[in-house]
Amino acid sequence: MKIIIHYALILFFTFVNSAFSESKYHHMPHGKFRNPEGSPVRDPNFKWSYKTFNEEKKKIKISIPTDHVVPKNQVLENINKLKNEDYILWIGHATFLIKLGDNMIITDPVFEKNMGPLIFGPKRYVDPAIDLKNLPKINYFLQTHNHYDHLSTRTIKNFPFKNTEVLMPLRLSKHFEKNNYKKIIELDWYDQKKYTDITFTFLPSIHWSKRSLWDTNKSLWGSFLIEYKDKKILFLCDTGYGKIYKELGKKYGPIDITFINIGAYNFFPMAPKKDSSIYHTNPEEALQIGRDLNSKKLVGMHWGTVVLSLEPIMEPAQRFKKNASKFGYNENDATLFKIGEAKKISELIK
């Protein structure tokens, strides 16, 4: 594990490298990474086309239900009301606040209107639930991978808490170093970082990395297992479905709450069939991962914010709820948030 630490308080923490196996299958020659052994591979008949994608994207109706978003002033009021509670708040897409005791965690923060380089890339149809300047003090910044809808250099530059602990996959530190972050920690799969009352373990996911024409899979991707007191929370985004999750379930389950992507799965007609993305689970695959992990609760994310694929914008949530019972979950176990909504963890885990 490569650790870049620019501060002197290291004695307060312990660092543990807990390898899941002796092999490093995901480390490839020439400095690239790959998915866990036995993961699905892209259908050779998948033919990406910006022209086709943009033509099909224009057919998607952006109709936002009135109850999909909590007003910003109410979001701030709720944060203040819950200051003595543990809670989860959805800012949008893959960005959440997770409060556990005195620990405030933010995941994959992106606060810009468009999720791409400069002024390019897909544009949000729902703004972030809170402005960057109004964030509560953040103790831990979790970065899962480098795609533009998860890693924003503008958010990193303007983030108000440069002294926060930033945990990320291998080879992502440059984005933070040049913006003068003080506590930067790169993790390989199965590496663990322990603090006084909270532990983070970086685990595999089935995905990829890319920000330019020249850096495909040159940085790692993954998920974060958060352990606090007797709770286990897994932030799993982005991922496709694969056998690795049964293995992780045996090793780390049961999980109390798993955050998982339920949108961005349909690329037909470029893909030979619908719902066939190997890098983003459809709602049913997300529910199956929950079963494989022995996760008590699921939180659906990566939907309802920006158009990244070709399914109707509310379809992921509808299918997630509709099919939950087929995988042994009731509607309360397969949880969805409004953008800006905060829920007490004590009410999620009963």
Stretches found by the model and what they are:
Residues K2-I10:
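Sec-dependent signal peptide recognition
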Residues P109-F111, N146, S205-I206, C237-T239, ...:
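Active-site metal-binding loops of divalent metal-dependent hydrolases
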